[in-house]
Amino acid sequence: VVKGRVVDAVGAPIAGAAVSIDTVTVTTDARGGYAFVGAPLGAAIVVLADGYAAGLATSAERVADVVLVPEAVAAETITVHGEAPPPAQGAGKLARADLERLPGAGNDAIKALEAMPGVVAAPMPLADTGLAIRGSSPQDSKILVDDFEIPMLYHVIGFRSIVPAEAIEQLDYIPGGFDVAFGRASSGIVNVTTRPGGETAQQAEVSSSDGGVLAQGKLAHGSYMLAFRRSVIDQLLPALLPDNLDLALTTVPRYYDQQLRIDYAPSRRWALRLSSLGSDDVLELYTTKTEAADKRLYDRTRFLRVTAAARYHDGPWTANLALSGIAQQTVFERGVMQHLTVASPGVTARAELGRTFGDAAGLHDVTWRLGGEVAVSRSSLDLALPQDRREGEPARPDDPMDTSATYHGAIWSPDFAAWTALGASLGDRLRLTAGVRFDAFERTHDFAVQPRGELAIKLAPRITARLSAGAYRRPPEYQTELLAPDLQAERATQLVGGVTVEPRDGLKLQSSLYYTDRSRLITRLGDQLTNDGRGTTYGAEWLATLHEGRWFGWASYAYSRSTRVDLPGGASRLFDYDQPHNLNLAVSYRFGRWQLGGRFRLYSGLPQTPVMSAVFDSDANLYVPVYGAVNSERAPMHHELDLRLDRQWRWGPAKMTYFLDIQNVYLNQSTLGYIYSFDYQQRGAFKALPIVPSAGLRGEF
C-alpha cells in the first residue's frame, strides 16, 4: 500500500486533489489523504489540484507530505517534498504506524505519548482526565479529537485510552507554544486526527484488554469508517479470580468505545465530514462479600460527541466550518452518604478563514487567518462529597460520612473566542508568525487578551531554529472550581526556543528549552478557592527519531523543574507532577513477516508529602494525620524494559497480525508511594505492577 497526504504551504490538507500513479488516479479525502493498493514502488506520483501548481513525488511505503504551492505564487511548476513543520518548537507528530510500533504501549495509541519528552511518566496512569505535561496538572492541558475537546482520555481501569489506534490517522503533541486557534489551556495540547475510511478490507481485533471491529469503505464521492470496541476484562477476570477471594465485584471494569466517520467531497472545492465519538465506563464493587451497602462504590462515566464539519478551498482561500455537540454524564456513589451526579450537554461552533497572498508589501509567502469559536455548556450538578483535593494538598483521612461539599443546581458556561494570525517570510531564512487570541469567559466575567508569536530562522538547508512567546489562559472549570464564580482564569506566559536538525532523510534531531511563568493559580485559603498562587516551570528536552528501511528508532530525554507558591509570602514547593528526569530509548526492526522491538525507560519518581504523626478525632472516630512539608519527599526512580513482537501472515483471503507487548519484563517493582495504617503509625510501600503483558490478534478481510 502506497499512501500519503497532500497539503498546502501552511500544512493544511488539500481535499479533492487528483493523485496519479501510472494510469491509476485517486482523489484525496477531507484530510488530504490518499492510498494506492498494489502500486509499484519507485514510480512517479503526480498531484494536481485547482489553484495549485502540480506536485511530484516518488511512491514508497512511507511517502512524505506533498506540499503544493498556489499558482499565484509560482510562475512555473514547483515541487516541494518533505514533512510539514511541527506546529511549535518541541512539538511532535506521531503517525499511526509509529504509534503501533512503539514497544510498551500495548497497541494503545495514546499511551505511546508517554515516550514524548515533556509528558510526565508513571507506572500507573496519573489521571483519567488527561496528561500531565511539563510538570503541570492534567487539567492544565487539553485533549482534542479533530479540534474538539473530549472530557476524558483513559478508561476507568486506566490502562486503555478511549480512542482506538485503528481509527487514528495522526497524533499531534504540542507541549507548549501552541497556535492562537487553540485556547482554554495553560500548558499543552494533544490533538488526535481521526482517519477517513479507505479501500482496504474490514478489520477485527481481540486482545487481552478488549475486542473491536472496524468497517470501512468507499461511497460515491466519499468514504465511511465505523469502529466499535468493548472490554473483555469483565469476562475474563471472574474466571481468573479464586472463589475464596474476599472481594465482590458487582460489575468488573467494563467499557465501550464507538467511532463513526463519513466523508463526502461534492466537488474539488468542498469536503464535508460527519463524525461521532463515544465512550461508556462502569465500575461497581463492594469491599467484601458480606458487608452492606455502606461499603458500596459505583462509578459510571459516559459521553457522546457528534461533529459536522465542512472545508472549502479555492485558490488562495481556505475556510473551515464545524459544529459539534456533546452529551456527557458522570455518576459516582460511595456508601450511603456520598454521591455525585453531573450531566453536561454542550455545543461548540468553530469557523476559520485563511488566505495566502504570495508576495505582499515586500514580504514573501504571506498567510493570514481569522477565526472564532462559541462554546456553550450547561452542567447540572447534585453532589455531597468531601472537599476535593487541590494540587499539593495531601490526602484527607478516609471518612465515608464526610459530605462537607454539597450543591444542587445548574451552571451555564458560555465562552466566546476570536483569533487572528499573520505569517510572512522575511527573505529566504526568516519567517515570522504573529497573532492574538481573545477569550471571554462569561460565567466568571473574565476577558483575556493573549498575544502569541514565533520567529523561525533557517540556519542551514537542514537546520532550523525557532523561538516563540505567548500568553495562555485556563478558565476555572475543574471540579468544584465551577462553584466559585469569583475565580479568574489561571495565567501562563511561555517562552520556547530550540533547534531542529535533519542530517539526512529519515533522521530528525530536535532540542528545546522552555520557561513558563504561572500566575493567578487557583489554591485553597480556608474553605474558599482563590487566585493567589504563582508558579515557575523550566526545562530542556531532546528528541531523535529514525525511519530507515526496516529500522525504527526513538530516543528522548527531558529535564524539568516545576515549583509554585500557594499564598503570598509562602514558601516555594514542588508541583505534584514535578519530574526532573525522563529518558526513553526505543528501537524496532522488521525482518520478513516479523517485527521485534524494545524500549528502555528511566524516570524520576513523583513528589510525596510525608506523615509525621496523627491525632485521634473522637467525633469522627478516626485518626487525622499531621503532615510534614508539602512534597518534601520523592518516590524512587523507576526503570523498566519493554519488549514487543509482531508477526504477519496470510490466512486465506485475510491478512492476520499477532502482537505480544510486555511491559517491565525484568519485574522491577518500584515504589510509587506509601499506604498508611489506620492510626498512621506504620506505612507500607505501594508498588508498581511487576509485569504488564498484552497480546492481541488482528484480521483484515
Identify the meaning behind each predicted range.
Residues S425-R431, Y514-D517, N531-M612:
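Gram-negative outer-membrane beta-barrel transporters
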Residues D29-G33, G51-G55, R62-V67, T77-D179, ...:
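Periplasmic N-terminal accessory/gating domains of Gram-negative outer-membrane beta-barrel systems
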Residues A271-D314, A319, L323-T348, E481:
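Flexible loop and strand-edge segments within Gram-negative outer membrane beta-barrel domains
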Residues V1-Q89, R134, A424:
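Periplasm-facing N-terminal accessory domains of Gram-negative outer-membrane beta-barrel systems
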Residues L383-E391, I457, P461-V496, L513-T530, ...:
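Surface-exposed extracellular loop regions of Gram-negative outer-membrane beta-barrel proteins
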Residues R601-L622, P636-E640, D646-F701:
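C-terminal beta-signal and adjacent terminal beta-strands/loops
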Residues S209-R230, L247-V282, Y298-N320, F357-D359, ...:
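Transmembrane beta-barrel wall of Gram-negative outer-membrane proteins
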